[in-house]
A protein has these predicted regions:
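Conserved mixed alpha/beta catalytic, RNA-binding, or beta-rich assembly cores of soluble enzyme
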Residues: 1-75, 95-97, 102-112
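Short, polar loop motifs at secondary-structure junctions
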Residues: 76-80
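C-terminal binding/interaction regions
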Residues: 67-70, 82-147, 153-154
Length: 154
């Protein structure tokens, strides 16, 4: 069994992202892009690893490029991720291919996919993704009643 097959096998144990280099496994759990963003923030050299992920859309493909991962498997892979993976020389395989990645509620397109829609550069994509996450967090805080101006507080 090769490295990507072993990483794929570990996805069945419940991890959302598994990296494997033939000796070491790195398993991450989390929703959306958070496992990839965590790995990026740690600034470790992961270029010798392959990766298996539950869902790989264009945004995730950009982050895999920044991590310098050379081989990925996605249980679900979006068609929009394929040109990015090819551009950065990342081999890919998948369980299912889809036209688009849906948001976690299944009501529309994933906001991260929308964020990178017109972007083809991984560094630019990372900046846009971080800004989108910041905006989404601020909007969620406002919905919870935080972040109101002093004038609106009685």
């Amino acid at each position: 069994m090769n490295n990507i097959e072993k990483a794929k096998e570990c996805l069945k144990n419940g991890a959302s992202l598994v990296l494997y280099d033939g000796k070491e496994f790195i398993e991450e759990n989390g929703k959306g892009l958070s496992p990839l963003l965590k790995l990026l923030s740690e600034k470790n050299d992961l270029s010798r690893f392959c990766a298996a992920d539950k869902i790989i859309g264009k945004a995730a493909a950009m982050l895999f490029a920044l991590l310098k991962i050379k081989n990925v498997y996605g249980e679900v892979l979006s068609r929009k991720a394929i040109p990015i993976l090819e551009k950065y020389g990342i081999k890919y395989s998948f369980g299912t291919v889809t036209d688009s990645i849906k948001n976690r509620y299944g009501t529309g397109i994933c906001p991260m996919e929308q964020t990178v829609e017109g972007i083809d550069d991984a560094d630019t994509a990372l900046k846009a993704i971080k800004e989108k996450i910041k905006t989404m967090r601020m909007n969620n805080m406002k919905k919870l009643g935080f972040g109101r101006s002093e004038e609106s507080v009685v």
